[in-house]
């Protein structure tokens, strides 16, 4: 930094964090937070500098004062070119604000509060924090991803949320998603798998412990520990209020500690995963067999191998622990029954999000920081999907996470580095649907070839310096048409500008500098629908430069409806591709779906949602005969968070994205505000109703009791079609929350997201982000299609693209 207001203080370059950067019209703009809390002064401000070169040097245009308060700047450019800055202020905890900008260095309006974190939600598990905003626009919707809770692993609650709005400054508490989109994977582990050390027939959290060294046989089941004290694990010398990772169960201030915990296991007990957090040297024994030993500090999960699991026996078992004080003082342990699964690493505290396009131009990727086990923070990346317009993240994942989590897809063709004009692409597959983009540096008379079949059938998108305009020039059958549109007054020549086109049949969409081209963006009938071609670049001056050309076969955001027994085929014949869509308007009587693989009428794979069987039915046909058929049940357990628009301490309201058929509810038996209070029948505290057709109806339970996971009560009922569920406290004087998240067994619903990935002879299938299977297929290059049998299904948010080969 080089400015007047930090000079002579302790606020130096080592206090810079939370950078944001963007390129506009030849300049790189860098924004950062100064986060200095010193005895000489406090300097907690947002700063701006700019440079002609990405690597600097950067100069602050205003050295006298800072740009704004306080931290986490993010600049977003809307489709009309208007700039907005989002930042965090310390007004109600850490609060997110937005502000219109005059230019990259100046503001044009007053700050507008977007939101703070809400009490009694996942956002306030510890501290009042909403920070790290990242704003993007896609499919005509605005998305803000943000962090909530304290960033430190000492709490372990840092998570990522999303708000979705219809204007850049329209984010508010009511349009937040009710749930975190990326959180700690231990939450799901604890909800799905039973911790044998805490749950038997009921909640049994107490361990026997002593602070005096016991006799030599203390690790054996037969040892008499009746003289030992009893306490809940989470042994610590201090309380970290709201912490998940270092929850205080019992105070511990001596150098060493010995623990014993008996638990039951049966023939149904499966694989075991030991989760342990300790600050000093620790040994853990299972029925006298050493299963864990480590010096110093750690926080990890250990999947016990076959040899170590052999120590487990039917009936009563004993876990014994010796642990010691480290630099700090904490110990906690869990033992999960994984059934036939394997536990992942501990992945937690995702934060500081950046959402960027992937290398192929179609995908979106989330880049963020997170922690694995007790390691230092690292960089993580996960795919961002859109279920039509709902943002979904395939994460949090790490190196050992089960399932299909590929690297970012490569384009069909990628040109690296700076080059002169290379004309139209050679030796690439022509197509009627593709994306092409590149950087263009010109004084005029250059641009991209949007479509090339031959000299009489082609299209050009060019920059015209003489007329300060851009143009689309097409030739179809030798007949020429040219349309020109004015460029912004401040458009600079001789610097790089980004051009992007998407062709889908006859439609051509054009972007300039990553926003819709000024004047006109969509040309619905610019090209012949069925005439395949390739893109490229052109330079009439022989002095232009191009950088980073990308060509990917595919299309984005097709919206259409089928009716009756109808089929629609699309796409090129490829061996590697991804294909997804949101399917709506499903009834309980019809079938609708797609051809994730279609070679011809006698060779294909069909995947259909069947409302009668409530299955995804997948059929492979070869040479006109059924080769195999698989059925994947669509019924599943969903976790719902209360919708703040319909929730307070008296009534808890939950909404479904689409009407769904339900037959079972699950409630956590721990009181929402006090986990140590364990309730025998949580359902007894509420009147429960479901919403259908705008009217509320009571749920009449058939059976209720303790679920397979003892932390939950269940309630079964005759299946109902519901748009929402609400829980109303039965007693008028009862003003407690009691519950937060609920479990819902969903049988069927009116809308699903479907995704298929073909990688040569393997086909991966997903529904609503859940991987159903990886199927072996053997077909030549194929395209995709859509199909219905009765009904009028609607397909929206359709995305299809080639997965190119990596070329290093």
Model-found features: residue ranges?
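Surface loop/turn signatures of beta-propeller and other carbohydrate-active proteins
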Residues: 1-20, 38, 56-77, 104-134, ...
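Short tryptophan-centered beta-strand motifs in secreted/extracellular beta-sheet-rich domains
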Residues: 73, 436-438, 494-504, 508-512, ...
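Short, solvent-exposed beta-strand-to-loop segments that form ligand-recognition rims
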Residues: 291-299, 513-534, 767-785
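Secretory/extracellular carbohydrate-interaction modules
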Residues: 421-471, 476, 563-626
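Aromatic, loop-rich ligand-recognition surfaces of beta-strand-rich domains
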Residues: 634-700, 706-748
């Amino acid at each position: 930094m080089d400015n007047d207001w930090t000079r002579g203080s302790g606020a130096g370059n080592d206090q810079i964090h939370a950078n944001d950067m963007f390129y506009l019209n030849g300049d790189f703009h860098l924004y950062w937070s100064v986060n200095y809390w010193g005895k000489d002064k406090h300097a907690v401000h947002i700063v701006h500098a700019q440079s002609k070169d990405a690597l600097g040097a950067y100069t602050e245009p205003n050295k006298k004062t800072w740009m704004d308060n306080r931290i986490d700047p993010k600049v977003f450019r809307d489709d009309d070119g208007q700039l907005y800055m989002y930042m965090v202020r310390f007004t109600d905890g850490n609060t997110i604000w937005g502000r219109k900008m005059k230019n990259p260095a100046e503001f044009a309006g007053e700050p507008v509060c977007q939101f703070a974190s809400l009490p009694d939600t996942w956002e306030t598990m510890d501290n009042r924090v909403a920070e790290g905003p990242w704003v993007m626009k896609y499919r005509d919707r605005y998305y803000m991803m943000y962090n909530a809770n304290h960033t430190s692993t000492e709490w372990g609650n840092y998570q990522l949320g999303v708000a979705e709005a219809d204007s850049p400054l329209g984010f508010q508490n009511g349009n937040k998603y009710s749930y975190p989109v990326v959180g700690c994977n231990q939450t799901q582990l604890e909800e799905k798998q039973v911790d044998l050390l805490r749950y038997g027939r009921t909640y049994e959290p107490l361990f026997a412990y002593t602070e005096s060294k016991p006799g030599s046989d203390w690790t054996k089941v037969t040892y008499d520990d009746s003289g030992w004290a009893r306490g809940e694990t989470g042994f610590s010398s201090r309380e970290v209020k709201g912490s998940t990772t270092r929850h205080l169960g019992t105070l511990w201030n001596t150098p060493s500690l010995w623990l014993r915990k008996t638990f039951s296991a049966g023939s149904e007990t499966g694989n075991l995963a030991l989760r342990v957090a300790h600050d000093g040297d620790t040994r853990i024994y299972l029925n006298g067999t050493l299963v864990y030993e480590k010096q110093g500090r750690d926080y990890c999960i250990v999947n016990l191998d076959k040899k170590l699991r052999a120590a487990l026996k039917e009936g009563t078992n004993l876990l014994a622990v010796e642990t010691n004080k480290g630099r700090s003082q904490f110990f906690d342990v869990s033992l999960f029954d994984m059934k036939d699964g394997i536990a992942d690493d501990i992945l937690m505290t995702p934060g500081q999000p950046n959402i960027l396009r992937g290398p192929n131009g179609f995908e979106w990727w989330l880049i963020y920081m997170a922690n694995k086990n007790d390691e230092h923070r690292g960089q993580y990346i996960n795919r961002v999907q859109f279920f039509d317009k709902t943002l979904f993240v395939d994460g949090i994942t790490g190196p050992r996470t089960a399932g299909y989590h590929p690297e970012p897809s490569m384009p069909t063709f990628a040109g690296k580095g700076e080059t002169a004009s290379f004309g139209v692409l050679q030796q690439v597959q022509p197509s009627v649907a593709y994306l092409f983009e590149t950087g263009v540096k010109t004084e005029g008379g250059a641009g991209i070839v949007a479509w090339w079949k031959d000299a009489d059938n082609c299209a050009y998108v060019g920059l015209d310096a003489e007329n300060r305009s851009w143009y689309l020039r097409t030739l179809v059958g030798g007949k020429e048409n040219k349309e020109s549109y004015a460029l912004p007054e401040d458009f600079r020549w001789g610097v790089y500008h980004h051009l992007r086109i998407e062709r889908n049949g006859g439609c051509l969409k054009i972007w300039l500098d990553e926003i819709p081209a000024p004047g006109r963006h969509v040309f619905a009938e610019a090209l012949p629908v069925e005439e395949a071609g390739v893109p490229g670049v052109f330079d009439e001056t022989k002095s232009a430069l191009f950088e980073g050309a990308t060509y990917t076969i595919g299309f984005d955001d097709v919206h259409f409806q089928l009716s009756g027994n109808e089929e629609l085929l699309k796409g090129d014949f490829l061996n590697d591709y991804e294909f997804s869509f949101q399917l709506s308007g499903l009834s309980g009587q019809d079938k609708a779906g797609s051809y994730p693989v279609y070679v011809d009428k006698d060779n294909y794979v069909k995947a259909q949602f069947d409302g009668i069987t409530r299955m995804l039915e997948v059929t492979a046909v070869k040479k006109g005969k059924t080769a195999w058929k698989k059925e994947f049940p669509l019924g599943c357990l969903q976790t719902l968070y209360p919708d703040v628009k319909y929730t307070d301490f008296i009534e808890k309201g939950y909404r479904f994205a689409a009407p769904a058929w339900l037959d079972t509810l699950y409630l956590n038996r721990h009181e929402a505000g006090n986990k140590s209070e364990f309730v025998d029948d949580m359902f007894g505290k509420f009147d429960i109703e479901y919403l259908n057709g705008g009217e509320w109806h009571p749920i009449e339970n058939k059976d209720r009791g303790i679920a397979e996971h003892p932390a939950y009560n269940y309630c079964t009922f005759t299946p109902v079609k519901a748009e929402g569920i609400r829980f109303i406290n039965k007693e008028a004087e009862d003003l407690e929350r009691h519950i937060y998240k609920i479990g819902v067994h969903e049988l069927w619903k009116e809308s699903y997201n479907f995704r298929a990935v073909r990688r040569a002879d393997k086909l991966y299938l997903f529904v609503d982000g859940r991987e159903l299977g990886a199927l072996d297929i053997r077909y030549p290059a194929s395209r995709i299609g859509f199909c219905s049998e009765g009904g009028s299904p609607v397909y929206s948010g359709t995305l299809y693209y080639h997965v190119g080969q990596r070329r290093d």
